[in-house]
């Protein structure tokens, strides 16, 4: 990892927790040692963004798990970047595979959301990744490059973007990409950024890995030169999240 890329660990709590259990988790995180050279962001369910921001130590940032592409309006069930910021959160996760595959969000919609969230001043954790049949068909590169292009077309300032590579076949399945598999895709993604955006953006943009990251797998993954951190699902609800935060130590 280049010295200019600050290690980034995101915890995606998905649709989990209640005030009591999340309060206990937050207590554990607040007591944990967070290395100065590591950025930590937690993404609680929408209903608990305010709660999490009030309870979490300021050293840990808060993200929303999704947002819509406009400021206000007749969009029942949606939230806007302005609302997210109003609750004290500074990041949003966009394009997560569950949004793409469970809720049918298209590349185009995700691109529009990325553009609006950035314009409104949020940091964006933009997710990309191939499904198992796509990996087995040998089209991993094609899929992730297409997804990345739609995101890149909507980004003016890359300093507010973290790219999260999440092989869909490794999310919540207990299967993890090997450190070598993760490094290979991350390296290719950095090459794509160099060719299609700029060398400076390729060098400075953090590319993080998501997909069944645990306390046991994080250290070897973190040692790969192009793995700049993690987006953690299930393990972010457990005390081992602290081990993942300290994966570079």
UniProtKB/Swiss-Prot annotation:
Domain of life: Eukaryota
Record has Isomerase as a keyword: yes
Effect recorded for residue 241 to L: In TPID; Hungary; thermolabile
EC number: 5.3.1.1, 4.2.3.3
GO molecular function, one term: methylglyoxal synthase activity
An annotated GO cellular component: nucleus
One Pfam entry name: TIM
Catalytic activity, reaction form: D-glyceraldehyde 3-phosphate = dihydroxyacetone phosphate; dihydroxyacetone phosphate = methylglyoxal + phosphate
Modification Phosphothreonine occurs at: 173, 214
Catalytic site positions: 96, 166
Binding site for substrate: 12, 14
UniProt xrefs under InterPro entries: Aldolase_TIM, TIM_sf, TrioseP_Isoase_bac/euk, Triosephosphate_isomerase, Triosephosphate_isomerase_AS
Residues modified to N6-methyllysine: 194
Modified residues (Phosphoserine): 21, 80, 106, 159, 198, 212, 223
Disorder association: Triosephosphate isomerase deficiency: An autosomal recessive multisystem disorder characterized by congenital hemolytic anemia, progressive neuromuscular dysfunction, susceptibility to bacterial infection, and cardiomyopathy.
Oligomer and partners: Homodimer.
Family: Belongs to the triosephosphate isomerase family.
UniProt protein name: Triosephosphate isomerase
Protein's organism: Homo sapiens
């Amino acid at each position: 990892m280049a010295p200019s890329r600050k290690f980034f660990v995101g915890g995606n709590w998905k649709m989990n927790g209640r005030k009591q259990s999340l309060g206990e988790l937050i207590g554990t995180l607040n007591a944990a040692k967070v290395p100065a050279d590591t950025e930590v962001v937690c993404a609680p369910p929408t209903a608990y963004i305010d709660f999490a921001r009030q309870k979490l130590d300021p050293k840990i940032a808060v993200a929303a798990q999704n947002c819509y592409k406009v400021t206000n309006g007749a969009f029942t069930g949606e939230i806007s970047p302005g609302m997210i910021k109003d609750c004290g959160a500074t990041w949003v996760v966009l394009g997560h595979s569950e949004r793409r595959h469970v809720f049918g969000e298209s590349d185009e919609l995700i691109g529009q959301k990325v553009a609006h969230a950035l314009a409104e001043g949020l940091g964006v954790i933009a997710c990309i990744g191939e499904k198992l049949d796509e990996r087995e068909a040998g089209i991993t590169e094609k899929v992730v490059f297409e997804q990345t292009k739609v995101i890149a077309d909507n980004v003016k300032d890359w300093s507010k973007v973290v790219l999260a590579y999440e092989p869909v076949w490794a999310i919540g399945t207990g299967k993890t990409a090997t450190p070598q598999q993760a490094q290979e895709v991350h390296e290719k993604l950095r090459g794509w950024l160099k060719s299609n955006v700029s060398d400076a953006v390729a060098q400075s943009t953090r590319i993080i890995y998501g997909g069944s990251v645990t306390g046991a797998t994080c250290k070897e993954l973190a040692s790969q030169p192009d793995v700049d951190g993690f987006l953690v699902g299930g393990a972010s609800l457990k005390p081992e999240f602290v081990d993942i935060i300290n994966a570079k130590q």
